């Protein structure tokens, strides 16, 4: 393998949708709150308000997990961030990659037969683009 420096791949449209939806969700919650007449807002209990904003916060957190997904490739390892879980897999443990027709994203397969989804490489971002990246990863397998 040649020393080319780290390369990071992130989901394209999926990332924009996740963060765009987060902004829209927060904006809608604030707009609805401000648009309610004062007499209605006074009837909302603390528990109801906390439930609403905790739900919005949970959705934003989930969407952030989707948006932060990435695959970083170095000469030593693959770093896979799926949601809030990070996996570092040395190239010596990589057996191969699977990306069949109709698969939403590629899967890294280790010598222990463990499978790690590469969520950052979304097929919806363009199968040909993802196929080029997967082919490059396959060439790096020792």
Ranges and model annotations:
Residues 1-44:
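N-terminal membrane-targeting/pre-transmembrane regions
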Residues 22-24, 53, 57:
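Alpha-helical transmembrane spans of integral membrane proteins, capturing the lipid-embedded, hydrophobic core
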Residues 43-54:
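Hydrophobic alpha-helical transmembrane segments
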Residues 55-91:
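Conserved beta-hairpin
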Residues 71, 106, 116:
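A broad, low-specificity signal marking well-ordered, structured residues that form hydrophobic/aromatic
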Residues 84-107, 112:
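C-terminal halves and exits of single transmembrane alpha-helices
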Residues 110-142:
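A membrane-cytosol interface segment of integral membrane proteins
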């Amino acid at each position: 393998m040649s020393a080319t420096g780290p390369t990071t791949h992130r989901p394209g449209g999926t990332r924009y949708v996740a963060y765009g939806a987060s902004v829209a969700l927060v904006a809608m919650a604030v707009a609805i709150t401000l648009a309610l007449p004062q007499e209605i807002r006074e009837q909302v209990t603390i528990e109801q308000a906390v439930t609403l904003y905790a739900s919005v916060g949970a959705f934003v957190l989930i969407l952030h997990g989707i948006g932060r997904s990435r695959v970083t490739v170095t000469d030593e390892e693959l770093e896979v961030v799926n949601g809030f879980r990070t996996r570092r897999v040395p190239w010596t443990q990589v057996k191969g990659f699977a990306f069949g027709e109709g698969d939403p994203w590629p899967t890294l397969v280790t010598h222990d037969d463990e499978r790690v989804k590469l969520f950052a490489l979304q097929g919806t971002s363009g199968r040909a683009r993802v196929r080029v990246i997967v082919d490059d990863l396959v060439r790096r397998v020792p």
